[in-house]
């Protein structure tokens, strides 16, 4: 769920999730246009991942995970919730791996700057 996603971003990327809201064309609710940088692409890929989840709502599904040898491992018996966890885990690692691409000019980017056709997932 979105609360757990926020927690994973802090655990894995070491950054507050506030930096990911209203960023670029995809970080936040919804998304259109072309991702503006690698950080925005992390959000695009996360949106695509959520779009492929079936049998539960990824924004509200509560999943389980453990930390093993410094790595986060998604667990539980529900395949849908495990898929949501994987979406969140991969996105948090993407944010971590692309920290240096974050650019304040894309924070609160006006929607008029995201008018291009979206690429397919």
UniProtKB/Swiss-Prot annotation:
Recorded GO molecular functions are:
calcium ion binding; calcium-dependent phospholipase A2 activity; phospholipid binding; toxin activity
**Predominant location category:** secreted
Q: Please give the SMART domains that the UniProt record associates with this protein.
A: PA2c
| Record PROSITE patterns | PA2_ASP, PA2_HIS
Cellular component terms, GO, for this chain's entry? extracellular region
Write out the catalysed reaction.
a 1,2-diacyl-sn-glycero-3-phosphocholine + H2O = a 1-acyl-sn-glycero-3-phosphocholine + a fatty acid + H(+)
The EC number(s) given in the record are 3.1.1.4
Report disulfide bridges, numbered on this chain: 25-114, 27-43, 42-94, 48-121, 49-87, 56-80, 74-85
Q: Where does tissue-level expression of this protein occur?
A: Expressed by the venom gland.
> Which GO BP annotation is one of this protein's?
lipid catabolic process
Highest taxon of the lineage: Eukaryota
Q: What is this protein called?
A: Acidic phospholipase A2 SpII RP4
The organism encoding this protein is Bothrops alternatus
